Amino acid sequence: MFKLPKLVIVTAIAVGSFSYVAPANAEDQLAVSICEYIAADDKNRLRSKLKSSRVKIRNIYDAIQCNGNNLLRHAVASNAVGTGEYIVKNLSKSSLADGVDIAWAEGNHAGSPLIAVIKDRAGL
């Protein structure tokens, strides 16, 4: 008597479970590529990847973490001066004005040439 509704429910569940497709991890792949290009200090490939993905550094700066660091800290830690300067130039002055990244860089990588670039951009 209740076989038809049970059959419909079971069929719906089965079809639903097989038809689910996990979302493509394009964002994850973009983040991995950006982190790799920063670590390799490859500014040209970084610019190309950002342009082809139609994103800007200032829009993704807070969202992407590379080895637990933001993009600028990752550049400082990787001694990636070229990509670090590119990141600094594409960030707003207000995002650097708090001095948190400068303090982190001075505390952990005092010899980095990016510290002067960050200070100059932030107006400190």
Feature-to-residue mapping (PLM):
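N-terminal signal peptide c-region/cleavage motif recognized by signal peptidases
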Residues: G16-P23
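Alpha-helix initiation and capping sites
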Residues: A80, K93-L96
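Short, solvent-exposed mixed-charge patches
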Residues: G123-L124
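Bacterial N-terminal signal peptides that target proteins for export
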Residues: M1-V10
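Ankyrin repeat structural motif
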Residues: D41-S53, N79-K89, G111-K119
